């Protein structure tokens, strides 16, 4: 049987000093016989997705202690991508993922914790904690803060979210009053932004990986049902500890749950629900921490045969996360995929012996359990609040329409092409990604003129100054992990293209990335990035570029000889922006840039460089 890791600091005469310090935290004699379970919380008043988490760590802690464990809570940082968007603050967002992963490792290993409960929610926090969990490979369970309710206003016929507020603000025809109304209505409650943006996508994928309870990705932050997820997480982590440390059951370890097939399941779900392209970046990073050989080619392979079964904002205005929950949440999407033969159902989870068992219990179209049906009727109250579990509103009915509802069957898919695609070509030899769920079919094949910008800031100025015309392909480069540094999100450029009426008339290509709120022909993660010698750095104004989503290709329409000649010239100049950007790159950001890999590797640290130290 494996010993508790915590015995390192709690047992033996020589650990008297450490035990004295543990006692100073409130531990008693009997506690030294129990597993010490770390609670990695991410409460902060800066982020609406985390503002309600302050007391939830102790809610879990009390349940852990009732179940026979010792709970010790600590906090990680959390960056709000929406607030950091459009200025130098966005340089820090992706690097914060590595800081979060490291901070969890530091706390858990420094104090020899036996297991972890990860209380996450927003864009980089769930991925960072996931990376740490797979790196540490001790019992873990995730429980997120949950999505916010969609916004409501008399001026719009659909639910609102952050992106609506950004688009209307850039629309010169909109009155100040209308902009203010959208601003005040778009984000009414605590929780992660209400569409299938990065935060909600990742919380859903953690369910598919098997590391979270059903409902983790879709139960509203404000709903009282979410409290049960936190309580159950506390009980479950103690049970996982007993199985591993008491019964030598290694099947409960995160690397044995989130194995290669589980990563395929998670990516299959992502493609089926049209999730954020950022999820690709984060799954690739997490796979490396788990030492799993899961890469962009696997994602490309899956994207070619997985249909789109769910369409949610920003891909469609009709549905938000509250509607996904009403339709049965993630296990109903997994159920549709399983019945279509597209899912590995024999894999364990933290709550069921197998995915198949979980689907049988939690898919609303497969179970008659009234408690499950009641759970998925949890809905929005429409009352602005920053308080968790503050309302108990329920829909009168479920959305179990698999022909025309929010979630579809494989036979009635929104499209037989999934919601994400990987493109390759001479402009992105190692690949780039596009969220096809948000691209109008009329522009799945698009040939246009390159309009070059060497920073997000200059592209925004150019778009707002009407420099971009119909038929242009806006290229924003030197915004990758190294070149930014930090691989900024390009939500403002894509939102402003929409506000200018160019959403279906232009494309955008970047070695940066996109917010989960992005839609339109927006292609990111071009690899290698410009700063690493990628061909995106060789494109010139006016060059023709051909994007062909059906054939998964993207090419600069010049000869190989011309491309090679340009590379020779660029090598002489150096791979950096032509003009010096007014951007303060601190020591912290330089350290990230020094080790960062391109997006096709998940923008993680270059371990080969570190192994040589």
Curated annotation (Swiss-Prot):
Pathway: Amino-acid biosynthesis; L-isoleucine biosynthesis; L-isoleucine from 2-oxobutanoate: step 3/4; Amino-acid biosynthesis; L-valine biosynthesis; L-valine from pyruvate: step 3/4. One of its GO terms (molecular function) is magnesium ion binding. The active site is at residue 515. Belongs to the IlvD/Edd family. This is Dihydroxy-acid dehydratase. PROSITE patterns: ILVD_EDD_1, ILVD_EDD_2. NCBIfam families: ilvD, PRK12448.1. It is an enzyme of class 4 (lyase). It comes from Pseudomonas fluorescens (strain SBW25). The lineage of its organism: Bacteria, Pseudomonadati, Pseudomonadota, Gammaproteobacteria, Pseudomonadales. It catalyses: (2R)-2,3-dihydroxy-3-methylbutanoate = 3-methyl-2-oxobutanoate + H2O; (2R,3R)-2,3-dihydroxy-3-methylpentanoate = (S)-3-methyl-2-oxopentanoate + H2O. One of its GO terms (biological process) is L-valine biosynthetic process. The gene is ilvD. Its EC number is 4.2.1.9. PANTHER family: D-XYLONATE DEHYDRATASE (PTHR43661), D-XYLONATE DEHYDRATASE YAGF-RELATED (PTHR43661:SF3).
């Amino acid at each position: 049987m494996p010993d508790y890791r915590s015995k390192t600091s709690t047992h033996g005469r020589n650990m008297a000093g450490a035990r004295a310090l543990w006692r100073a935290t409130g531990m008693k004699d009997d506690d030294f016989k129990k597993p010490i379970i770390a609670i990695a919380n991410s409460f902060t008043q800066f982020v609406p997705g985390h503002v309600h988490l302050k007391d939830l760590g102790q809610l879990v802690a009390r349940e852990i202690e009732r179940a026979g464990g010792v709970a010790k809570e600590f906090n990680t940082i959390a960056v709000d991508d929406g607030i950091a968007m459009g200025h130098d603050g966005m340089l820090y967002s992706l690097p914060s993922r590595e800081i979060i992963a490291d901070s969890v490792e530091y706390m858990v290993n420094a104090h020899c914790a036996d297991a972890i409960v990860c209380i996450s929610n927003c864009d980089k926090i769930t991925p960072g904690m996931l990376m740490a969990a797979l790196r540490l490979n001790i019992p873990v369970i995730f429980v997120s803060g949950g999505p916010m309710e969609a916004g409501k206003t008399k001026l719009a016929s659909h639910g609102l979210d952050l992106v609506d507020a950004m688009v209307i603000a850039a629309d010169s025809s909109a009155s100040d009053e209308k902009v203010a109304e959208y601003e005040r209505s778009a984000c009414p409650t605590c929780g992660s932004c209400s569409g299938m943006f990065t935060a909600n996508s990742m919380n859903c994928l953690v369910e598919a990986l098997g590391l979270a309870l059903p409902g983790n990705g879709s139960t509203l932050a404000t709903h009282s049902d979410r409290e049960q997820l936190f309580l159950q997480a506390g009980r479950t982590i103690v049970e996982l500890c007993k199985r591993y440390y008491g019964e030598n059951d290694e099947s409960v370890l995160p690397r044995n749950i989130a194995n290669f097939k589980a990563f395929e399941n998670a990516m299959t779900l992502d493609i089926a629900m049209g999730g954020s392209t950022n999820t690709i970046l984060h799954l690739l990073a997490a796979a490396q921490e788990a030492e799993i050989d899961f890469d962009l080619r696997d994602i490309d392979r899956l994207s070619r045969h997985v249909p789109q079964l769910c369409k949610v904002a920003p891909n469609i205005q009709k549905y938000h996360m509250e509607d996904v929950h009403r339709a049965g949440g993630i296990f109903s999407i997994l159920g549709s995929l399983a019945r279509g033969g597209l899912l590995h159902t024999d894999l364990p989870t933290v709550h069921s012996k197998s995915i198949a068992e979980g689907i049988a219990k939690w898919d609303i179209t497969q179970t008659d359990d009234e408690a499950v049906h009641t759970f998925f009727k949890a809905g929005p109250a429409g009352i602005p609040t920053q308080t968790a579990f503050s309302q108990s509103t329920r829909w009168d009915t479920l959305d179990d329409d698999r022909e025309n509802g929010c979630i579809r069957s494989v036979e009635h898919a929104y499209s037989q092409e999934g919601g994400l695609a990987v493109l390759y070509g001479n402009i992105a030899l190692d690949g780039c990604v596009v969220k096809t769920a948000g691209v109008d079919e009329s522009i799945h094949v698009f040939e246009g003129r390159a309009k070059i910008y060497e920073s997000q800031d200059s592209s925004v100025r150019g778009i707002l100054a009407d420099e971009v015309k119909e038929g242009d392909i806006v290229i924003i480069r030197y915004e990758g992990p190294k070149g930014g540094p930090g691989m900024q999100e390009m939500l403002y450029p894509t939102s402003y293209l929409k506000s200018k009426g160019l959403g279906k008339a232009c494309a955008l290509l970047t070695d940066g990335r996109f917010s989960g709120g992005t839609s339109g022909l927006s292609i990111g993660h071009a690899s290698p990035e410009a700063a690493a010698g990628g061909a995106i750095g060789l494109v010139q104004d006016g060059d023709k570029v051909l994007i062909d989503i059906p054939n998964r290709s993207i090419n600069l329409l010049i000869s190989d000889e011309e491309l090679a000649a340009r590379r020779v010239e660029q090598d002489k100049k150096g791979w950096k922006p032509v003009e010096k950007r007014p951007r303060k790159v601190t020591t912290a950001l330089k350290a990230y840039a020094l080790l960062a890999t391109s997006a096709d590797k998940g923008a993680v640290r270059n371990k080969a460089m570190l192994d040589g130290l």
